[in-house]
Amino acid sequence: TKSDLPISSEMLNFWNDNGYLIIENFKTNAECDDLINRSKELIEEQDFNNQQSVFDTVSQSHNDDNYFLESGDKIRFFFEEKAQLNESNLKKNKQYIVNKIGHALHDLDDKFIKFSKNHDLNEIAKAIGFQDPLLLQSMYIFKQPKIGGEVVCHQDSTFLKTEPESTVGFWFALQDATKENGCL
């Protein structure tokens, strides 16, 4: 029989036992392509000459960076640590020097709003125990070839602190991970 839950009871049990859940093909290829293309457009529209904030999870130098700290309600761009931020790269190679875009894409960009604020995602959040799920933060994280920074082992709750713990991250792989595109 069909369950009223948006996920099966087996999936819910797996979530409860392991703290994560993999849902294959939750989003269509077209929906994923929309975000990939939109991220490229956002980068092309951005003038990076007056902004050079670097994001890396090892030294976490961004923790003292107001551009980063004040990004919760904005769309902001953060560079790879190994990116050469010269005039040529800031104009010609813009697509390959950005580490991530964050943190309010889900509130400020139509394509990301459509992807993030939908019934299915809300229902999954409710199925895993959230009574009134809210979107707090969104990021588009790049895996840049040859210069992509290391992401050290971490839990998102380290960065998004609530008491009691009440946050969960939804992570979407927009492309298949391969050796050619910087697999995880």
Which positions does each model-derived feature cover?
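Short aromatic/hydrophobic contact patches that present stacked aromatics
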Residues: Y20-I22, W171
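Catalytic core of non-heme Fe(II) oxygenases with the double-stranded beta-helix
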Residues: L108, N122-K126, I147-L184
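Non-heme Fe(II)-dependent double-stranded beta-helix
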Residues: T1-D17, E24-C153
